[in-house]
Curated annotation (Swiss-Prot):
Belongs to the UPF0357 family. This is UPF0357 protein YCL012C. Residues 1-25 form the signal peptide. Keywords: Signal. Pfam families: DUF2015 (PF09435).
Length: 132
């Protein structure tokens, strides 16, 4: 009887340890937990420390673990993306069924192309001189 009890305790300790390990190892899971925490706080009228311009971006899915707007940025005076950029990135996400990071990369590569810059950041102009 005690053997079964110790086996159950051992099983739960291993299971909980694996869950904790995966949360710390995988940034995406930790980011999801942060996002869920902020949603619970907003539902119960608790203060979320976000700059006002970033709250709409958070609600519309314009964030990721690489572009983290959930972190404390209430002292940040910069604004979020402008409305035209937000709409273009949302369209890219919906049309190509890709994540926010990939849509943001495609958007920036298009903007680079419009301004004479290659996707890798080098100038397209053949007269341009670069240092290696």
């Amino acid at each position: 009887m005690w053997d079964l009890f110790y086996f159950k305790v051992f099983f739960w300790v291993v299971l909980i340890s694996l869950c904790i390990f995966m949360v710390h190892r995988n940034g995406k899971v930790a980011n999801k937990f942060r996002e869920l925490r902020s949603r619970f706080q907003s539902r119960f009228n608790r203060h979320i420390s976000l700059n006002d311009s970033f709250t709409d971006d958070l609600e519309s899915g314009l964030h990721s673990s690489n572009f983290d707007i959930i972190s404390e940025n209430n002292n940040d005076t910069r604004g979020g993306l402008d409305d035209i950029s937000k709409n273009e990135i949302k369209q890219i996400m919906e049309m190509n069924n890709i994540s926010f990071d990939k849509a943001r990369l495609l958007y920036m590569e298009r903007k680079f192309g419009q301004n004479g810059i290659a996707p890798d950041g080098t100038p397209i102009d053949p007269k341009a001189f670069t240092f290696d």
